Amino acid sequence: MRQKRKGDLSPAELMMLTIGDVIKQLIEAHEQGKDIDLNKVKTKTAAKYGLSAQPRLVDIIAAVPPQYRKVLMPKLKAKPIRTASGIAVVAVMCKPHRCPHISFTGNICVYCPGGPDSDFEYSTQSYTGYEPTSMRAIRARYDPFLQTRHRIEQLKQLGHSVDKVEFIVMGGTFMALPEEYRDYFIRNLHDALSGHTSNNIYEAVKYSERSLTKCIGITIETRPDYCMKRHLSDMLTYGCTRLEIGVQSVYEDVARDTNRGHTVKAVCESFHLAKDSGFKVVAHMMPDLPNVGLERDIEQFTEFFENPAFRPDGLKLYPTLVIRGTGLYELWKSGRYKSYSPSDLVELVARILALVPPWTRVYRVQRDIPMPLVSSGVEHGNLRELALARMKDLGIQCRDVRTREVGIQEIHHKVRPYQVELVRRDYVANGGWETFLSYEDPDQDILIGLLRLRKCSEETFRFELGGGVSIVRELHVYGSVVPVSSRDPTKFQHQGFGMLLMEEAERIAREEHGSGKIAVISGVGTRNYYRKIGYRLQGPYMVKMLK
């Protein structure tokens, strides 16, 4: 049969040839150990075949031969940092609602944009509606099922493995919403993964356990006064494993002046109750609030990391932004508030990052709010990078969990661990004995996996954890996502590090804590992993009796 000449081919056939040529060049570059600029290759190859449009990334990904998928997918993945920690994060927003403390303080916090009564009226509290997550939520009319399905589809098209999902429930104080709405919202998150239509939260969780796409955790944003015993019990029922608590400042006068509507004592209580229930605690902190100043800001972060009443597991650092329609905007306009200069802010963030202990993870260093909406505050979109560069100039290292993760190190610095060993760090926090176990390469300061073990205090209110129980609050092996049922020798997930960490945790609980039982706060989708190693479900926890 006579082969068609290039001029006889249709645009669709030319596009297929272009895609094949792009993949061939990628394979050759891989075999020669060369780095390749994908955009340049796409442009050049499309021009070679006389096409005005480049081939889409989605089509290239779909056409990669099976034997080359493992080596080429990391090169084709858009924004590889999204799944570098081993999990695809899906942020969803609940419907707009008023801040719960308006009823007794008379107003919202002075710096807070958004909400039903704000200039950004279709946005949720503390968001403007122009953040990427907000815009996705508005497009889906705040429907939790659609938000989840759309985001997962988007991540898949960009070449990410969406085998494990962690939800972040954003949009103000979720736990202040009516119970009926909360149940509907969480039920739909689980149903979006499992494909089942549930009648209640218990049914949704049951089907989510066996879902192909695993829900390995749910994070809920809340306030210290909505983090009490009944709220924590409800969140455990939902399959929530991590809390993001809005602290903002450890100073009582600042909390009062900014109209927070809760005390610092409430912050300490909420941390204690949350950790004794097994939750991981991430704090939101805001440097550059009114009436603080640089030195006082540094002092509060020193206090925050060193005082056992605080010591969070994670931190989101949100330098104060002046946004129109807020009380702070009026103070700024009248000259009664002035933001730090850009250089002072970079210096401050660098000094804060230098204080972070190796068991704390810094999740974010600034808000996602678009710069045109910011009247005063952060002027750079890459504040974390600038702060890390400043630390490098000063000869200081940032030793938080995220900076040392194996997946992040591989993407940013192309370094891989060489000699891995077990490292143990013990500290006291919120009335309990904490042990941070990790597998690390100490020479290169790379973290492969971690486990947080706590000897619960006697004040724990959950009956499953009473009478001397140790709880594993987090088990995480880092590196790009590897599906739960498979192994990849070049990735660090599913290579046995998780099992080794669990064995050491059980030994410490039995021999050092003197515990007769160990519990795990497990994401709904990872419960079967613990069943395989001898755990059973008791309430929301996976538990095992220790001999």
Swiss-Prot record:
Binds 1 [4Fe-4S] cluster. The cluster is coordinated with 3 cysteines and an exchangeable S-adenosyl-L-methionine. GO terms for molecular function: 4 iron, 4 sulfur cluster binding; acetyltransferase activity; metal ion binding; phosphorylase kinase regulator activity; tRNA binding; tRNA uridine(34) acetyltransferase activity. Tyrosine-phosphorylated; phosphorylation on Tyr-202 does not affect elongator complex integrity or ELP3 protein stability. Also serine/threonine-phosphorylated. Changing Y202 to E/F: Substantial reduction in tyrosine phosphorylation. [4Fe-4S] cluster binds at C99, C109, C112. Pathway: tRNA modification; 5-methoxycarbonylmethyl-2-thiouridine-tRNA biosynthesis. This is Elongator complex protein 3. It comes from Homo sapiens (Human). The lineage of its organism: Eukaryota, Metazoa, Chordata, Craniata, Vertebrata. The gene is ELP3.
